[in-house]
Amino acid sequence: MSYKIVALPGDGIGPEILNGSLEILQQLSKEFHFEYELESHDFGGIAIDNHGKPLPDSTLNACKNADAILLGAVGGPKWTDPNNRPEQGLLGIRKALGLFANIRPTTVTNGTSHLSPIKEERVANTDFILVRELTGGIYFGEPKQLSENDALDSLTYTRDEIERIARVGFELAQKRHKKLTSVDKENVLSSSKLWRNVINEVSQSYPDVEVNHLLVDACAMHLITNPSQFDVIVTENLFGDILSDEASVIPGSLGLSPSASFSEQGPRLYEPIHGSAPDIANQDIANPFGMLLSVAMCLRESLNEDKAADKLENVIYQLIKEGKTTRDLNGNYLTSEIFNYVKENL
């Protein structure tokens, strides 16, 4: 079977970290005998320069017909028109593809625990996934109102929205350690009362998965004091936005965190969580690990190449353990050198 992959290098450090990662993907495809077709398209600021908008029709059509999308990074200070921002392309692609679930792994290995700002004994063996609902909640609820003296935001969720994000969480938990933690604010929010009820109902279809409920404030505390207790966390949009940023500091660098966005049946989008870092672009000093780990997620979740994903992840964490890292991880290695080391160790 041949897969269709669309590459969106984007802006800033995006092209250099994605293009190097695509060479790694090609090497893995030869070793593990899988085939794919690759297309590269403009997206974000570069698309504004070349096409007048951040998400050209040609890019969107290619994404709709893909099995997976790999995104480098988007944005930068060059593009200042508030009505035509590079980041609007990301919002557009999420909406067009129905990307409703954001998946954020947080992993700390024996070789990376020294990088964390939290004590090593607290973060040792941390390995969890945070599943955030992307399309509902207070960011999108209606009505919204702003006046000089008062303001209104609406936190709304439907049963269907909660059920579909719950199933993503339970499916991931079934493939991992069979533990799911649902995070809400059930003690004060009506939307969270519905959230908890639906989670409990969906859990009946997954009797092998252990379910726990945590209030969001308690979860925020446990992420710092005992992050290794978690396997899969599932939560709504606002809580997930905050908790995923909190979780991103646990490994010690934004450059170590991949992410994915899932639709119900269409293509999935994979990207590192860091920004475009235009101040270090084209200097061969960008950290490529987040992009490489996003490729590993793509291998596992979209291409069903678990062994290739495992091998790539193992090589990455071994290099970090050996201190072969970029300067943001206190290393002295160039981006190109990291890619060469990955190729050699594969």
Swiss-Prot record:
It is an enzyme of class 1 (oxidoreductase). GO terms for molecular function: 3-isopropylmalate dehydrogenase activity; magnesium ion binding; NAD binding. Substrate binds at residues 94, 104, 132, 217. Its EC number is 1.1.1.85. InterPro entries: IsoCit/isopropylmalate_DH_CS (IPR019818), IsoPropMal-DH-like_dom (IPR024084), Isopropylmalate_DH (IPR004429). The keyword Cytoplasm applies. It comes from the Bacteria. GO terms for cellular component: cytosol. Homodimer. Belongs to the isocitrate and isopropylmalate dehydrogenases family. LeuB type 1 subfamily. This is 3-isopropylmalate dehydrogenase. It comes from Staphylococcus saprophyticus subsp. saprophyticus (strain ATCC 15305 / DSM 20229 / NCIMB 8711 / NCTC 7292 / S-41).
